[in-house]
From Swiss-Prot:
<dbReference type="GO" id="GO:0016779">
    <property type="term" value="F:nucleotidyltransferase activity"/>
</dbReference>
<comment type="function">
    <text>Cyclic nucleotide synthase (second messenger synthase) of a CBASS antivirus system. CBASS (cyclic oligonucleotide-based antiphage signaling system) provides immunity against bacteriophage. The CD-NTase protein synthesizes cyclic nucleotides in response to infection; these serve as specific second messenger signals. The signals activate a diverse range of effectors, leading to bacterial cell death and thus abortive phage infection.</text>
</comment>
<dbReference type="GO" id="GO:0051607">
    <property type="term" value="P:defense response to virus"/>
</dbReference>
<keyword id="KW-0548">Nucleotidyltransferase</keyword>
<keyword id="KW-0479">Metal-binding</keyword>
<dbReference type="GO" id="GO:0005525">
    <property type="term" value="F:GTP binding"/>
</dbReference>
<keyword id="KW-0051">Antiviral defense</keyword>
<keyword id="KW-0808">Transferase</keyword>
<feature type="binding site">
    <location>
        <position position="53"/>
    </location>
    <ligand>
        <name>GTP 1</name>
    </ligand>
</feature>
<dbReference type="Pfam" id="PF18144">
    <property type="entry name" value="SMODS"/>
</dbReference>
<dbReference type="GO" id="GO:0009117">
    <property type="term" value="P:nucleotide metabolic process"/>
</dbReference>
<feature type="binding site">
    <location>
        <position position="205"/>
    </location>
    <ligand>
        <name>GTP 2</name>
    </ligand>
</feature>
<feature type="binding site">
    <location>
        <position position="56"/>
    </location>
    <ligand>
        <name>GTP 1</name>
    </ligand>
</feature>
<feature type="binding site">
    <location>
        <position position="307"/>
    </location>
    <ligand>
        <name>GTP 2</name>
    </ligand>
</feature>
<feature type="binding site">
    <location>
        <position position="210"/>
    </location>
    <ligand>
        <name>GTP 1</name>
    </ligand>
</feature>
<feature type="region of interest" description="Disordered">
    <location>
        <begin position="348"/>
        <end position="381"/>
    </location>
</feature>
<feature type="active site">
    <location>
        <position position="121"/>
    </location>
</feature>
Amino acid sequence: MELNSQFNAFLTNIRPTDPQKEDWKGGAKTLRERLNNYEPLKDIVVSTFLQGSIRRSTAIRPLNGKRPDVDIVVVTNLDHNQIAPQEAMDLFVPFLEKYYPEKWVPQGRSFGITLSYVELDLVITAIPASGEEKNLLEQLYRSESVLTVNSLEEQKDWRLNKSWKPSESGLFISNSANIQDAPLSEWKAHPLVLPDRDENKWGRTHPLAQIRWTAEKNRACNGHYINLVRAVKWWRQQNSDNLPKYPKGYPLEHLIGNALDDGTPSMGKGLVQLIDTFLSRWAYVYSLRSKPSLPDHGVEEHDVLARLSAEDFCLFYEGLEDAAIIARSALASQDPKESAELWRKLFGTKFPFPGPQGGDRSGGFTAPTQPAEPQKTGRFA
């Protein structure tokens, strides 16, 4: 059975909590305000924005007191042809020493900042374009479409367009219902560049392309795509003893998007379809004991599976073969309790049993139409 009510409850149980959302929004806003008011960097910082699974609404609830991981991109107007990667990152060290003493560490392509309730990953980037193209891109990166700290799930009508604005009422519904994504020609050909201190070179990255693709895919899948990503991530976490460490994070998310058909009718059917498609699509690659390659949505020369070993891919494939048997049986079962027991084999106790009235029918848990607005605290003051 599809057990839609139970899947809704399951998703509520594995999403980040409202206090966790408050933590990362507070941390991001505080960092942005401090950067905007830090005089030595005022002339080079164009904007800061959230990226990663937090922004794309594909993050799951951290376990065992683990802090949420939040990726924050700092867009600068630095000329990457005139400044070395190490020099660019060094410009931000005095800022970090002033506001985050003994809380930050340098990383290969970013700075890690550990706060009481959140882990921030600060990524320094630059706009490589010049002239009028650069001016137009700076306008986009300064727009509310990019600056919003709301996730795709919270802002369902979000579009990558400098004319898009959220509602002034505080609700997660904007006043821009008829605005569509800006044409690809206006922004996609100009990824950001980021410094790699380990290799001492600049590389290309396009977080906006990943966010926009995710939003578009989620709409095409009736809102189920981001939730199926969460479900698979949770399954992977629950079965970590029997699965390889990789793929995880964005490579796993990308594999799911590659396998999921548009028009997803429900979580149960979507999960079975994407697993079956994954297994059939990569059966030949698996038979060779190899692995596929998949181009990044923003920087096509990047293979998102480049760091995934063939051995780990094959072990993951075998894990999905086992999961497919259970998922198909759970979907086919006409007994609500039996179906729930099978889904729980995949997802653990966060997936609830149906009530006395059974499974696929009206009533029971109803997902809220929009997230609750968390109470404010002074945690990031």
